[in-house]
């Protein structure tokens, strides 16, 4: 299958160079200008797509080269951008930064190569003159097929930009697409897992509007759209997805404590016949009625542990449901919620042991899980690409999977049973289609269990 898909990848020279701010400014400016735009994020990050969604009013896809083969990457990109004027893809870390310090595997560069996407590089030019060009020279010559077609200078001044732009275009033949000056009043706060979530930024809309207004003055949006339209059509074989059976109802925990979900994973469950019913472990007293499954995603339960403990009614409701065999997927924060306690605050108590602050990132990054037993989602021996990103650890993290990092380091993790997956690793259902099918099928069995 071949699909036209105008697209543009916003990459950065390094983490902290301003690519998220620049991406958000561009998205908001395009939306305000009447351009129909889609958004995507390289890698497994949950938070940046939340900002994209707030701006464009639609989901943002994760394009993860560790999770997906070429067909899936291109399918998700084409599906998300269908009918849009352009898709703006935000990179992750520095352009060439991948797994390990000496590899570009799973990098933004790899996404650009595998999706044939033209790239605009964000370069932090604060306090720099000719040195900014030296940095650009390095990026342009590090890889022959670098796909860099334009540059945006972040932190640049209106006085410096014309000279630097002229030098960039004359020396390198890439397009200078504008600049974004320092705007400290529009900065986005961070915490240990990156930016704070979009829902926690009280004045997010105002900040985005200020960024967009400035971008309309200083960034050549027409040039960006021209670069996006230069992207070749996407060629791929779409996955075979069909709903096989009657619909089921899956409760999905969605509030400030549980907000880490891949929107494409949720969309896949819907395509397989699931109705997703949101509920809040923070504020609801009980689970929704007539559920056939439960999905507890990640998030920040440790920040809301006192409130989660105080809601004893829904903790009891969830414990009773899981213990009676309601099919349940609980990732990271959802897994923590099923343990006995978080930092001394009582949780659902389905699983033994408590969770504690490890004081540093724990088992951070990509890993491949190998199932050690047959379970609801996975057959023994199946391998699953996964990701961990957390500072909190558990006394009993489970041992039903062997996790192995690309470096070779390995450990046992997670719980897997006939009706349960619970563990720190996150995975994407589009990287594990059979797991999504099995989850929905388990929910169908639950639906008929009491008939």
Where do the language-model regions lie?
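A short helix->loop->beta-strand "cap" motif at the edges of active sites that frequently abuts
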Residues: 117, 174, 323-327
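A short, charged/proline- and glycine-enriched loop
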Residues: 3-6, 243-249
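Cysteine-nucleophile active-site neighborhood
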Residues: 301-375
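Internal gly/pro-rich beta-alpha loop/helix module
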Residues: 129-242
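C-terminal and late-domain segments of enzyme folds
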Residues: 112, 217-218, 244-246, 258-268, ...
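Phosphate-binding active sites in nucleotide-utilizing proteins
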Residues: 246-323
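Beta-strand->loop->alpha-helix junctions that form or flank phosphate-binding loops
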Residues: 41-42, 176-184, 275-283
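ATP-dependent carboxylate-amine ligase catalytic core
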Residues: 2-21, 27-115, 119, 123-147, ...
